[in-house]
């Protein structure tokens, strides 16, 4: 289980004037959002295994590949999600790929890019700007165009996405839909204090917490 941080909860209650229930609800939503982001990343990557025409999602290595066209893709959600070290590591990995095969094309595909683009990726290594036309920075719309031949393919996907998600969710059994029972579970642990329940869950194996009481 992802435990709620009791120290942070205490600060949030005292500093921001929130109730403990509000703080717990906000933390649960944050954790659900993090999990949802992982599912979204899975969706962006794995949709290409259903497109065919040589596109695959390998178990390891690049996120998406096309062996026939020798295209290797690293996918990121936003243009600012990689720090300098991560960017350099990714770029050097792509350099290794194009050095092994002169016909290889490596792409950093960004779901949310700064612009619609398909351009050489330029980075700084040891304060020196380097680039290669075979290592490219590509926005998601341009990548969908590259994959399907339709420059509006990504736009068309976005147009039907709400309907598709709604259909999938409505087809789920009630037991498969995420239920938020955290407050109920916490209340069962210490009916007199939600905050006490949170402390006990996190620190129950610590010395003295078997007899924990707020002053």
What are these regions, as identified by a protein language model?
Residues 58-60, 67-68, 100-103:
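Short, well-ordered loop/turn elements at secondary-structure boundaries
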Residues 35-59:
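Short N-terminal edge-element motif at the start of the domain
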Residues 79-145:
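Catalytic cores of nucleic-acid endonucleases
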Residues 123-215:
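Charged, structured surface patches that assemble and position nucleic-acid processing machinery
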Residues 64-82:
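Conserved catalytic cores of phosphodiester-cleaving nucleases, focusing on short active-site segments
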Residues 47-51, 94-101, 202:
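Hydrophobic, Leu/Ile/Phe/Ala-enriched alpha-helical segments that form helix-helix packing faces
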Residues 63-65, 107-108:
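A structural signal for short, well-ordered beta-strand segments and their strand-loop junctions
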Residues 1-42, 203:
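Interdomain/boundary linker segments immediately adjacent to catalytic/signaling cores
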